[in-house]
Swiss-Prot record:
Cofactor(s) needed for function: Zn(2+)
Function per UniProt: Participates actively in the response to hyperosmotic and heat shock by preventing the aggregation of stress-denatured proteins and by disaggregating proteins, also in an autonomous, DnaK-independent fashion. Unfolded proteins bind initially to DnaJ; upon interaction with the DnaJ-bound protein, DnaK hydrolyzes its bound ATP, resulting in the formation of a stable complex. GrpE releases ADP from DnaK; ATP binding to DnaK triggers the release of the substrate protein, thus completing the reaction cycle.
Source organism per UniProt: Shigella boydii serotype 18 (strain CDC 3083-94 / BS512)
InterPro entries cross-referenced by the UniProt entry: DnaJ, DnaJ_C, DnaJ_domain, DnaJ_domain_CS, HSP40/DnaJ_pept-bd, HSP_DnaJ_Cys-rich_dom, HSP_DnaJ_Cys-rich_dom_sf, J_dom_sf
Protein name (database record): Chaperone protein DnaJ
Gene Ontology MF term list: ATP binding; heat shock protein binding; unfolded protein binding; zinc ion binding
Gene: dnaJ
Cofactor note: Binds 2 Zn(2+) ions per monomer.
Binding residues annotated for Zn(2+) 1, in chain numbering: C144, C147, C197, C200
Zinc finger extent (CR-type): 131-209
Entry similarity comment: Belongs to the DnaJ family.
Length: 376
């Protein structure tokens, strides 16, 4: 069976330049590659034809022989053993077209970026609300100041890896394919350090603690994270440094609780003020302010003091302070006080005075109805 013309296989003219041939090969190789057509024998045979045509037409000597003698140039005795499969380097094609399949292409492995670091910072509520600048000390890896990150002894330079010749990749042939792998000798860096730095022992980085001044913006809360770009560990062999993340944890406050941008606090008042009303001082983060308590105030009533909360870290309106009233039962009464309270209770008409204690009346009426229903 006559073999198909190489130019026809690739779909190019006989005057096509090498770049046109490469372009045609990339397109066809992608289409008929066995990994994309598993089990398809026709596609596999087509791929072999495409590869054979490419190898001949991109070799100037083989192409000239083919143009003059056709396929006869590569038959036994035709060209002094030149034959197909003479070991052409397809790394330029495979590196571009099949980089993902064969280990990521031809390029040298990039030096690793430095690791990110985390620092847990505890703040008081006042610091979180107002903002604060704090100094912290963190252990990290910094660029070696002797070799400046190269890992080589001063006055020397890292040498090109003799295994991969500086590419960071080695080529392993498997059948028709040249498989690219990370060089095991230099771990993909493309260079070797023959004379390592005495301080960092060739690593390019040294362990060190550093002090940083961290500005905490006003309004942060537990769980917020502040990023300091480039303040993490130094990268390997000149690669970028990682980042430092400051994780905020706000301590519990003895008076205030925070929910979002609002603050809450409990304000105890005696039962006389709860009944008669009056004025008390309540704490805020800016100092004491007066709060008017109306008569007949019950435990649990909330009083809102606008703008006395927390300003959002993202800007916008300021939160409020909500004061929850707790009516205290008097303790440590003397005989006179007990007598006065007894007289007061009698003036109410007893423990369940209907007029002065509407909630008590409602409660006891409900209890009475419950037992009445049980006895019916």
């Amino acid at each position: 069976m006559a073999k198909q013309d190489y130019y026809e296989i690739l779909g190019v003219s006989k005057t096509a330049e090498e770049r046109e041939i490469k372009k045609a090969y990339k397109r066809l190789a992608m289409k008929y590659h066995p990994d994309r057509n598993q089990g398809d024998k026709e596609a596999e045979a087509k791929f072999k034809e495409i590869k054979e045509a490419y190898e001949v037409l991109t070799d100037s000597q083989k192409r000239a022989a083919y143009d003059q003698y056709g396929h006869a140039a590569f038959e036994q005795g035709g060209m002094g053993g030149g034959g197909f499969g003479g070991g052409a380097d397809f790394s330029d094609i495979f590196g571009d077209v099949f980089g993902d399949i064969f280990g990521g292409g031809r390029g040298r492995q990039r030096a690793a970026r430095g690791a990110d670091l985390r620092y847990n910072m505890e703040l008081t509520l006042e610091e979180a609300v107002r903002g604060v600048t704090k100094e912290i000390r963190i252990p990290t890896l910094e660029e070696c100041d002797v070799c400046h990150g190269s890992g080589a002894k001063p006055g020397t330079q890292p040498q090109t890896c003799p295994t991969c010749h500086g590419s960071g990749q080695v080529q392993m042939r498997q059948g028709f394919f040249a498989v690219q792998q990370t060089c095991p000798h230099c771990q993909g860096r493309g260079t070797l350090i023959k004379d390592p730095c005495n301080k960092c022992h060739g690593h390019g980085r040294v362990e060190r603690s550093k002090t940083l001044s961290v500005k905490i913006p006003a309004g942060v809360d537990t769980g917020d994270r502040i990023r300091l770009a480039g303040e993490g560990e130094a990268g390997q062999h000149g690669a970028p440094a990682g980042d430092l993340y400051v994780q905020v944890q706000v301590k519990q406050h003895p008076i205030f609780e925070r929910e979002g941008n609002n603050l809450y606090c409990e304000v105890p008042i005696n039962f006389a003020m709860a009944a008669l009303g009056g004025e008390i001082e309540v704490p805020t983060l800016d100092g004491r302010v007066k709060l008017k308590v109306p008569g007949e105030t019950q435990t649990g009533k909330l009083f809102r003091m606008r703008g006395k909360g927390v300003k959002s870290v993202r800007g916008g309106a300021q939160g409020d302070l909500l004061c929850r009233v707790v009516v205290e039962t008097p303790v440590g009464l003397n005989e006179k006080q007990k007598q006065l309270l007894q007289e007061l209770q009698e003036s109410f008409g007893g423990p369940t005075g209907e007029h002065n204690s509407p909630r008590s009346k409602s409660f006891f009426d409900g209890v009475k109805k419950f037992f009445d229903d049980l006895t019916r």
